[in-house]
Swiss-Prot record:
Signal peptide: none annotated. Residues 135-166 are annotated as: Disordered. It comes from Drosophila melanogaster (Fruit fly). SUPFAM superfamilies: Translation proteins SH3-like domain. One of its GO terms (cellular component) is cytosolic large ribosomal subunit. This is Large ribosomal subunit protein eL14.
Length: 166
């Protein structure tokens, strides 16, 4: 699979450092191999020069002319409905979860730990009941190793797979 996130006009990037950290910007122009001109009319980012080392390129791209003014970038941004697309992306969801988790206080961490314990207790009980049921029935658990051996035996006999090929 070829690389698809190029530094190009209209590419949406997430600022990873500096005062714009966490904000989305659109690349308007490439100044040189280290710097680009960015603009984020709907994210509160004024048009400015920004280092590529401080940007993470996203898969999103909006169409507007080379070195377009801010009003055209804003129009293209709203037409593409980028805000909604970004909110449902796994990257955004993960960033929101990290932010939420870092803002937990001591009591919230306690509640989370308690809820995890309760969940694990329910899972353990369910697993043990299934384990006891299979032990009582006398049915062996199917392991991958046993399954492979059964398939080899069937193949040697000329079972299902051999019949399917003919």
């Amino acid at each position: 699979m070829p690389f698809e996130r190029f530094v190009q006009t209209g590419r949406i990037a997430k600022a990873s450092a500096g005062p714009l950290k966490g904000r989305l910007v659109a690349i308007v122009d490439v100044i040189d191999q280290n710097r680009v001109l960015v603009d984020g009319p709907l994210t509160g980012v004024p048009r400015q020069e920004y280092r590529l080392n401080n940007l993470h390129l996203t898969k999103y791209r909006i169409k507007f002319p080379y070195t377009a003014p801010t009003r055209i970038v804003r129009k293209a941004w709203t037409e593409s409905d980028l805000k909604a697309q970004w909110k449902v992306s796994p990257w955004s969801v993960k960033a929101q979860n990290i932010c939420k988790r870092s803002s937990l206080n001591d009591f919230d961490r306690f509640k989370l730990r308690y809820a995890k314990r309760q969940r694990n207790k329910l899972l353990t009980i369910a697993f043990n009941t299934l384990k006891k049921r299979t032990k009582a029935d006398g049915t062996p658990r199917v392991l991958k190793k046993d399954r492979r051996e059964r398939l080899r035996a069937e193949k040697a006999k000329g079972g299902k797979k051999a019949a399917a090929k003919k």
